């Protein structure tokens, strides 16, 4: 049965490009077979899904062509082999009684270390002003945050930043903390979510450690509280935060708060807290425009040392909602796919990888639209594109148009052939393979094809 699979691989090698075959078919390993099923091993679940979606029908046809029999294909994901243990961990020896006092000293030291750690802010070092992309939608909040970081507790105290989920509020509060800490490593900075503040307060009440809790927060130089809206309706938490706020404000310490809403629009927030938030500066962050989203993608890809073509960045920016986290998730997914398959990122790859995420806000692409766009690009007539003339200035545009038709429409080979002057399906297949090969080996030619695709979606 393995011979059948080997012959099928040979068949597939003849109809697929070298890169496609080496990426998706060659890694498949024959594990065994039953009367009507062939079992193949795949490297990963991701690999299995891709091969199933794209090449399963082709694999079945290639196997059937060997002996005329149809087989089911069963995939098994290769198991990860656990690393062998190099050394057995020694068993803990019982400690002599004379070490008990020493253990007590160690416990005290641990408590002191714990206290020190509490003074170390859990800021994200990646969130800095340098890594933040400023644009019209967030410029005010960005400038206000920089002003606070450069001169804490001077003009804008408290600073209240509000905006929708995933627009950069958390990035800015971390950037403020990181900037102040870089200037003054001894600065006492506390960065908490409102939920964490509430949970810690509840535990302090439970274990009768409220004095420790209050002292911890009221000795800070900078208090950063994320998502203050989650304190709404929590009377005891708001009470404690109110007194903490007053103590820090009166000591001329900076307070920065974020929320998804303007203070007066947060239901369940006490009026006395609302009024205090309005003492300082309130800055909003709006959803970014396409240009800002493109700039964010380009900066992120540069940080990851990944080449992201302009047309791909535009495609992601236009297809994503205004949530920056969603945008970053798309980029990570695309980078992962490119890395796993060893391919360069292109617009066609992005469309394929993002097809379940991005519903393109464009009209349906038709063969006629592609013919018109290609003809305009090469300054020829559509009738010439559909003709049988074999001069190079017509053959190459014709093959490009056929390739894009196969890629962007649901038309079959015979249907495409009919639209190009009644050409047979073998001519259409030849054109597609010719363009695939040229794209793989000629960057300038690839850019031409990408440019035509881009015109179709703008």
UniProtKB/Swiss-Prot annotation:
Subcellular location: Cytoplasm
Domain of life, per lineage: Bacteria
UniProt keyword annotations, A-Z: ATP-binding, Cytoplasm, DNA replication, DNA-binding, Lipid-binding, Nucleotide-binding
InterPro entries tied to this protein: AAA+_ATPase, Chromosome_initiator_DnaA, Chromosome_initiator_DnaA-like, Chromosome_initiator_DnaA_CS, DnaA_C, DnaA_dom, DnaA_N_dom, DnaA_N_sf
UniProt-annotated binding residues for ATP: 166, 168-170
Residues covered by region (Domain II): 84-121
Chain segments carrying region Domain III, AAA+ region: 122-338
UniProt region (Disordered), positions on chain: 80-120
Keyword Nucleotide-binding: yes
Ranges annotated as biased composition (Basic and acidic residues): 80-119
Gene Ontology MF term list: ATP binding; ATP hydrolysis activity; DNA replication origin binding; lipid binding
One GO BP: DNA replication initiation
Entry GO CC: cytoplasm; plasma membrane
Family to which the UniProt record says this protein belongs: Belongs to the DnaA family.
Stored HAMAP family: DnaA_bact
Biological role: Plays an essential role in the initiation and regulation of chromosomal replication. ATP-DnaA binds to the origin of replication (oriC) to initiate formation of the DNA replication initiation complex once per cell cycle. Binds the DnaA box (a 9 base pair repeat at the origin) and separates the double-stranded (ds)DNA. Forms a right-handed helical filament on oriC DNA; dsDNA binds to the exterior of the filament while single-stranded (ss)DNA is stabiized in the filament's interior.
Quaternary structure and partners: Oligomerizes as a right-handed, spiral filament on DNA at oriC.
NCBIfam families reported for this sequence: DnaA
Domain notes: Domain I is involved in oligomerization and binding regulators, domain II is flexibile and of varying length in different bacteria, domain III forms the AAA+ region, while domain IV binds dsDNA.
Protein name as it appears in the record: Chromosomal replication initiator protein DnaA
Lineage, broadest ranks: Bacteria, Pseudomonadati, Thermodesulfobacteriota, Desulfuromonadia, Geobacterales
Gene that this sequence comes from: dnaA
């Amino acid at each position: 049965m393995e011979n059948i699979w080997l012959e099928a691989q040979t068949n597939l090698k003849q109809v697929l490009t070298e890169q496609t075959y080496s990426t998706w078919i060659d890694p498949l390993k024959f594990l065994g077979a039953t009367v009507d099923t062939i079992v193949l091993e795949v490297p990963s679940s991701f690999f299995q899904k891709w091969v199933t979606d794209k090449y399963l029908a082709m694999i079945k046809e290639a196997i059937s062509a060997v002996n005329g029999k149809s087989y089911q294909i069963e995939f098994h994901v290769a198991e990860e082999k656990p690393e062998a243990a190099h050394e057995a961990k020694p068993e803990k020896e019982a400690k002599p009684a004379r070490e008990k006092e020493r253990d007590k000293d160690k416990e005290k030291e641990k408590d002191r270390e714990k206290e020190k750690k509490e003074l170390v802010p859990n800021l994200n070092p990646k969130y800095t002003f340098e890594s933040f992309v400023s644009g019209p939608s967030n410029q005010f909040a960005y400038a206000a945050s920089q002003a606070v970081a450069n001169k804490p507790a001077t003009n804008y105290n408290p600073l209240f930043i509000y905006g929708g989920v995933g627009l950069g509020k958390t990035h800015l509060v971390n950037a403020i903390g990181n900037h102040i800490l870089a200037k003054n490593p001894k600065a006492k900075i506390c960065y908490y979510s409102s939920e964490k503040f509430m949970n810690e307060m509840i535990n302090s009440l439970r274990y009768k450690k409220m004095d420790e809790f209050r002292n911890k927060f009221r000795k800070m130089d900078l208090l950063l509280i994320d998502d203050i809206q989650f304190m709404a309706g929590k009377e005891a938490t708001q009470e404690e935060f109110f007194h903490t706020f007053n103590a820090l404000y009166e000591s001329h310490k900076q307070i920065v708060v974020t929320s998804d809403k303007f203070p007066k629009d947060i239901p369940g927030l006490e009026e006395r807290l609302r009024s205090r938030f309005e003492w300082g500066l309130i800055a909003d962050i709006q959803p970014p425009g396409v240009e800002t989203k493109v700039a964010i993608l380009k900066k992120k890809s540069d940080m990851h040392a990944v080449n992201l073509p302009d047309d791909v960045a535009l495609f992601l920016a236009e297809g994503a909602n205004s949530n920056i986290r969603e945008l970053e998730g798309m980029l990570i997914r695309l980078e992962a796919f490119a890395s796993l398959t060893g391919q360069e990122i292109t617009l066609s790859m992005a469309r394929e990888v993002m097809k379940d995420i991005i519903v393109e806000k464009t009209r349906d692409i038709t063969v006629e639209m592609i013919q018109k766009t290609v003809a305009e690009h090469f300054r020829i007539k559509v009738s010439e594109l559909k003709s049988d003339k074999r001069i190079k200035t017509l053959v190459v545009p014709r093959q490009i148009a056929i390739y894009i038709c196969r890629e962007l429409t649901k038309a079959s080979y015979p249907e495409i052939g009919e639209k190009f002057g009644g050409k047979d399906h073998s001519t259409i297949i030849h054109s597609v393979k010719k363009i695939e090969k040229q794209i793989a080996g000629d960057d300038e030619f690839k850019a031409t094809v990408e440019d035509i695709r881009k015109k179709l979606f703008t």
